[in-house]
Amino acid sequence: MPIGIFYDDDAYPEINILKHFSLLDTSRYRIFASRVQDTYGRSCRMNLPFIRVPSTVFETIYYVIRPERFSPVRTQVTDVQTVSFVGMIIDRKVLNNHLNDIHDELFLYYDDFFFGYKLVLSGQKIRYSPEIKFIHDISIHGRCICPEWKVYYLCRNLLLLRKLLPVPRIFSVLSIVLRLSKYLAILPWQRKKFRYLYFIWQGILHGLKGISGKYH
């Protein structure tokens, strides 16, 4: 089948990706989420899809404590509910039918999350495929978000999700508050704390007002 392969300009597939893909079962699946690792060979948590999206505040807390309950085992094939635009392989026909679910308003963060969630809501199945690997040179390591403007998009786009998909809601109000609080909680680990706080404030303000687009 004709396919589209998604990855950022700071990521790249391993050699022989098409050969590995040709060995996968494409009779039951049209969307595939690859295994994404950083340049040190460690799994990129930010690119790991959800088996089940932690939507409520209780699920969000449980996800913080036991993230493995919501994420696939790194080396195990399983169905997932979301995708990352680093390492997604998709049938071109399915992509063309769902182009309207890729929103420029969610620039940088949550655009892929939203897209995958909408695919599943439409009845599509997504296969987490660790046989296919991508390398991603990530700039967010542990609790340090660098450059600081990235937290703006993390906060703003989290709020914009509710406007783009009011029903069914991806995250509850309390779940969103908890997720936003997390970015304040990791303030001590940031290099430029006042700049970081400024972008959190702007992200929340613009998210509540429905302001989108590039802002850094």
Q: Over which residues does each language-model region extend?
A:
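A short, conserved alpha-helix in the catalytic core of glycosyltransferases
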Residues: 82-83, 87-101, 105-132
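Nucleotide-sugar-dependent glycosyltransferase catalytic core
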Residues: 121, 125, 135-156, 191-195
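Conserved donor NDP-sugar-binding/catalytic core segment of glycosyltransferases
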Residues: 16-47
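Short, flexible, basic/aromatic active-site loop/helix in glycosyltransferases
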Residues: 52-81
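Short, high-confidence coil segments that cap the C-terminus of an alpha-helix
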Residues: 1, 28-29, 124
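Acidic metal-phosphate-binding loop of nucleotide-sugar-dependent transferases
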Residues: 10-12, 106
